[in-house]
Design a protein with these regions (language model features):
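Glycine-rich phosphate-binding loop signature in dinucleotide/nucleotide-binding domains
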Residues: 7-13
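Glycine-rich oxoanion-binding loops at beta->alpha junctions
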Residues: 1-7
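Mixed-charge interfacial surface used for oligomerization/domain docking
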Residues: 15, 22-44, 50-183
Length: 183
């Protein structure tokens, strides 16, 4: 609310992107803040139906449209049109956090760790789902994961492909970057 208030006072239109409504209440919190500021007519909350970089891709497009002078309504319509084209997925290095988040049992996390399983998590229709399980050393898994996405990557807007990671070895990131540049 504190972030919105100065813009509301200036009478500006505000567009907020939330993590997928099925994963978080952040969108609802933003809508409630707009109501409390009596600015529901000036604040548009867009359910990204995604997370992390998937939201970022939509925000980049919205910023481009805003710089072209588009209204919040025009931007919202354009974002809703590209939302189904946004792909976000990742491979987890450990099942510990999936277990802690209630997404897998303790037995599955233990067995998966012993077998060196690394599930590919995809965001589909605003929800996370495991689409494939890789097995082995993380560096090999990530390269296999990248190769499995080749068709989607070839059809992507080249300057909108992100390598998003959390503490991944620099060598792995560079290997993925090199692979992508050769596509």
């Amino acid at each position: 609310m504190e972030v919105m208030q100065p813009f509301v006072e200036e009478g500006r239109e505000i567009i907020c992107f939330s993590i997928s409504d099925s994963m978080s209440t952040s969108g609802n919190v933003m809508r409630l803040a707009a109501e409390e500021l009596e600015a529901s007519d000036k604040v548009t909350v867009i359910n990204s139906a995604n997370l992390s970089t998937g939201i970022g891709l939509q925000v980049i497009q919205a910023a481009i449209l805003a710089s072209e002078g588009k209204t919040a309504a025009e931007i919202t319509t354009a974002i809703e049109a590209i939302r189904p084209k946004v792909r976000a997925s990742f491979v987890v290095d450990t099942l510990t956090y999936l277990h802690r988040g209630g997404r897998c049992s303790a037995v599955a996390a233990l067995a998966g760790g012993m077998l060196k399983l690394h599930p590919r998590i995809v965001v589909v229709d605003g929800a996370m789902d495991a689409s494939k399980k890789y097995r082995g050393k993380l560096s090999s898994v990530i390269l296999s994961y990248t190769r499995d996405m080749e068709e989607d990557l070839k059809n992507a807007v080249p300057d909108r492909v992100f390598i998003t990671h959390s503490g991944c070895d620099r060598e792995i990131v560079e290997a993925v970057r090199s692979y992508l540049e050769r596509l």
